[in-house]
């Protein structure tokens, strides 16, 4: 088996191959200085296109780096030598493959044929030349396409002496005779000015100068973009502004009209859908009415009560499927609303959670509360004559700060009415916390407290002792004393009286302010 090429041979070979002008650009995208190669096609690629080829798979394209990889074998080098970007471009163009997409291009019939051709040429070159670095076509063709011969500078070619170019021209044979004749003619013209340097008009000298620089000047001495019309600044007239404004107004009107049309169409579609839905509801309601007519009386009543029917029901306020009716609000007959006794708990704001409820006339709260507590027949409780604490405006607290818990009410009311507690327990030798805060519910304590209250009386009766003074309440009557414990009733009564006093103070202050402000009128 032949020895593998070393790193020096690989670098020398690729330096010669990359010197070919067509191999200086990527075969797919045309990027300069490609450093990767596809052995399958013998072409040079950039790093981006090499990634695309790598994604195609090794069965379509085998990628190697011309600078980093050093494990090339002779067959791979022969494939690169017999290939090249120029040969691949000509083959693909000849077979009508002009696609830019890599997947389409390298899966085509032309790519398959070119892969087979490169493999056959590489195998033939390997069998013929073995481990020789160069092959015949490269030794004869590559120097002719070297950049030193083809990409020569124009000024260097005409300013340097032609001695270096004459020997190669003389060795080319009959095919280079016209070029040799041109070189000899140019040499004779260049020597003419030196022989006639004293002539009054050295025309050959000036002609030679004009052929070197004069022909290049017109291409280099191009003016700027000022000569081209339509690219510079133009004067704007008032007519152009008016035209632009008119176009903007027309566009704005068109947009408004389109928006109005769209809105109208949306409304029409919505009305049509609502009308259709209402018709469907009516049809369903009629069907349900027919079903309910077949039921018996009791079953029909149960169906209506449970919401199983769609007919109008007296016990149900409203149904979605029933006919729509306009509900008008009626004006209340009297300013004072009739409420039950339990609504009084919500008015005070002490035992109810949430916002307090008020009557229509806030100034009548004090009177109504006072009248309720003063009439013993209304509540069926004993009225105890106690000294009311002094109520001021500063002692009124906001509704949001009022307590919503019974224990908080007891603590706060006992703290605010400390003077009343002193008067109440002034003659007692010892008291407990339950007695002080009103939490004692024992019957013995109730009896003792009543005895202390009636200690100064000359005579007492059973109705005074047990809280049934008038005996107006029969066995079947319901009073607040039957609902709440006695201690809670007393505490609640005291709280209501306090609130009534505060409201009275507020009403008095409002009336005084009104009299002070409007009294002079």
Curated annotation (Swiss-Prot):
SMART domains: ArfGap (SM00105). Interacts with the coatomer complex. Interacts with the C-terminal appendage domain of COPG1. It is a peripheral membrane protein. The modification N-acetylalanine is found at residue 2. GTPase-activating protein (GAP) for ADP ribosylation factor 1 (ARF1). Implicated in coatomer-mediated protein transport between the Golgi complex and the endoplasmic reticulum. Hydrolysis of ARF1-bound GTP may lead to dissociation of coatomer from Golgi-derived membranes to allow fusion with target membranes. InterPro entries: ARFGAP/RecO (IPR037278), ArfGAP_dom (IPR001164), ArfGAP_dom_sf (IPR038508). A zinc finger (C4-type) spans 26-49. It comes from the Eukaryota. Residues 97-521 are annotated as: Required for interaction with coatomer. One of its GO terms (cellular component) is Golgi membrane. GO terms for biological process: COPI coating of Golgi vesicle; protein transport. This is ADP-ribosylation factor GTPase-activating protein 2. Keywords: Acetylation, Coiled coil, Cytoplasm, ER-Golgi transport, Golgi apparatus, GTPase activation, Membrane, Metal-binding, Phosphoprotein, Protein transport, Transport, Zinc, Zinc-finger. GO terms for molecular function: GTPase activator activity; zinc ion binding. Residues 242-308 form a coiled coil. PROSITE patterns: ARFGAP. It comes from Pongo abelii (Sumatran orangutan). It is found in: Cytoplasm; Golgi apparatus membrane. The modification Phosphoserine is found at residues 140, 146, 237, 240, 312, 334, 340, 364, 368, 432-433, 513. Residues 11-127 form the Arf-GAP domain.
């Amino acid at each position: 088996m032949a020895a593998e090429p070393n790193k020096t041979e690989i670098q020398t070979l690729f330096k010669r191959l990359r010197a070919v002008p067509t191999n200086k650009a990527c075969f797919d995208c045309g990027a300069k200085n490609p450093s990767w190669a596809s052995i399958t096609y013998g072409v040079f690629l950039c790093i981006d296109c090499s990634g695309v080829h790598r994604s195609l798979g090794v069965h379509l394209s085998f990628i190697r780096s011309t600078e980093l990889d050093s494990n090339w074998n002779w067959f791979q080098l022969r494939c690169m030598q017999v290939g090249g970007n120029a040969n691949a471009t000509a083959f693909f163009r000849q077979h009508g493959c002009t696609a830019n997409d890599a997947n389409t291009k390298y899966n085509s019939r032309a790519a398959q044929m070119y892969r087979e051709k490169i493999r056959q040429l590489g195998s033939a070159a390997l069998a013929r030349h073995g481990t020789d670095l160069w092959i015949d076509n490269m030794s004869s063709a590559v120097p002719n396409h070297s950049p030193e011969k083809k990409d020569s500078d124009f000024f260097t070619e005409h300013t340097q002496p032609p001695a270096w170019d004459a020997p190669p021209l003389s060795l080319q044979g009959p095919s280079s005779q016209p070029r040799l004749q041109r070189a000899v003619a140019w040499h004779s013209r260049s020597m003419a000015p030196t022989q006639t340097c004293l002539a009054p008009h050295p025309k050959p000298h000036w002609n030679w100068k004009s052929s070197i620089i004069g022909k290049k000047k017109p291409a280099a001495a191009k003016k700027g973009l000022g000569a081209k019309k339509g690219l510079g600044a133009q004067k704007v007239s008032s007519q152009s502004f008016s035209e632009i404004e008119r176009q903007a107004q027309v566009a704005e009107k068109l947009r408004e009209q389109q928006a109005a049309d769209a809105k109208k169409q949306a409304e029409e579609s919505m009305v049509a859908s609502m009308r259709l839905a209402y018709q469907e509801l009516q049809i369903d309601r009629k069907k349900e009415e027919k079903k309910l007519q077949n039921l018996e009386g009791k079953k029909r009543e149960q169906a209506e009560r449970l919401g199983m029917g769609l007919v109008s029901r007296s016990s149900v306020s409203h149904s979605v499927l029933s006919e729509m009716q306009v509900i008008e609000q009626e004006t209340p007959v009297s300013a004072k609303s009739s409420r039950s006794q339990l609504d009084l708990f919500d008015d005070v704001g002490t035992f109810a959670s949430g916002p307090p409820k008020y009557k229509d006339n806030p100034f009548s709260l004090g009177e109504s509360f006072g009248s309720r507590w003063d009439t013993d027949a209304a509540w069926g409780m004993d009225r105890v004559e106690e000294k009311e604490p002094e109520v001021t405006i500063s002692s009124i607290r906001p509704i949001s700060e009022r307590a919503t818990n019974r224990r908080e009410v007891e603590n706060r009311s006992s703290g605010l009415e400390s003077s009343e507690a002193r008067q109440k327990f002034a003659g007692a030798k010892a008291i407990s916390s339950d007695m002080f805060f009103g939490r004692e519910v024992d019957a013995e304590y109730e009896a003792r407290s009543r005895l202390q209250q009636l200690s100064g009386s000359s005579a007492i009766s059973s109705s005074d002792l047990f809280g049934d003074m008038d005996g107006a309440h029969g066995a079947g009557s319901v009073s607040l004393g039957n609902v709440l414990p006695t201690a809670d009733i007393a505490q609640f009564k005291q709280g209501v009286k306090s609130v009534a006093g505060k409201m009275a103070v507020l009403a008095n202050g409002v009336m005084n302010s009104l009299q002070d402000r409007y009294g002079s009128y």
